[in-house]
From Swiss-Prot:
PROSITE patterns in the record: RUVC
Subunit structure as annotated in this protein's UniProt entry: Homodimer which binds Holliday junction (HJ) DNA. The HJ becomes 2-fold symmetrical on binding to RuvC with unstacked arms; it has a different conformation from HJ DNA in complex with RuvA. In the full resolvosome a probable DNA-RuvA(4)-RuvB(12)-RuvC(2) complex forms which resolves the HJ.
Cofactor note: Binds 2 Mg(2+) ion per subunit.
A Gene Ontology molecular function term of the record: crossover junction DNA endonuclease activity
Record function comment: The RuvA-RuvB-RuvC complex processes Holliday junction (HJ) DNA during genetic recombination and DNA repair. Endonuclease that resolves HJ intermediates. Cleaves cruciform DNA by making single-stranded nicks across the HJ at symmetrical positions within the homologous arms, yielding a 5'-phosphate and a 3'-hydroxyl group; requires a central core of homology in the junction. The consensus cleavage sequence is 5'-(A/T)TT(C/G)-3'. Cleavage occurs on the 3'-side of the TT dinucleotide at the point of strand exchange.
Catalytic reactions of this protein: Endonucleolytic cleavage at a junction such as a reciprocal single-stranded crossover between two homologous DNA duplexes (Holliday junction)
Name of this protein: Crossover junction endodeoxyribonuclease RuvC
Length: 178
């Protein structure tokens, strides 16, 4: 399975692609960052992120996309930009009918380091080891995108099976009962 991980952001949107599957070691396909100047208007920055994500989706042709869930931050402006960039990636994947996994930072950290409280250096170190890279991807947004892709590679299939096994609830009815 090929997974595109997206670490959303307006200034730097990390993108990382890994291949892997049951019984196979994960391998790096590509990693990079879409950058936008802080001086540009938000609409222009979002368009640049959208175009970058579209280009990656068309070129690397992933089987799934993993996006970091936005978490609460003190800086509302930062969290808004992160949420908007994440939404752009989600819509791009949805338009192509790709499965989308959303993961909190602590879920991603736990998946790649064993601890949901790992710092950026620990995540970068483990991504480097897990993908057998000569050095940690830079900037940290790129390493985080690869960590997201690895998280989905390992957790996505199990989550999909759990969703498929859970009975659908009737819409608009609390608890799904009539």
């Amino acid at each position: 399975m090929r997974v595109l991980g997206v670490d959303p952001g307006l200034t730097r949107c990390g993108l990382g692609v890994v291949d892997g599957g049951p019984g196979r070691r994960a391998s790096l396909v590509e990693v990079g960052v879409v950058r936008t100047p802080a001086s540009d208007e938000v609409a222009d920055r979002l368009r640049a992120v959208s175009e970058g994500v579209d280009e990656w989706l068309d070129r690397v042709r992933p089987d799934a996309v993993a996006v970091e869930k936005v978490f609460s931050q003190a800086n509302v402006r930062t969290v808004m930009g992160t949420a908007q960039a994440g939404a752009v990636a989600i819509v791009a994947a949805a338009r192509r009918g790709l499965p989308i996994g959303l993961y909190t930072p602590s879920e991603v950290k736990a998946a790649v380091t064993g601890s949901g409280r790992a710092d950026k250096a620990q995540v970068g170190f483990m991504v480097t080891k897990l993908l057998d890279l000569p050095e940690a991807p830079r900037p940290a947004d790129a390493a985080d995108a690869l960590a997201l892709a690895l998280c989905h590679l390992w957790r996505g299939p199990a989550l999909a099976r759990m969703r498929a096994a859970t009975p659908a609830r009737s819409p608009g009815v609390p608890g799904g009962r009539r």
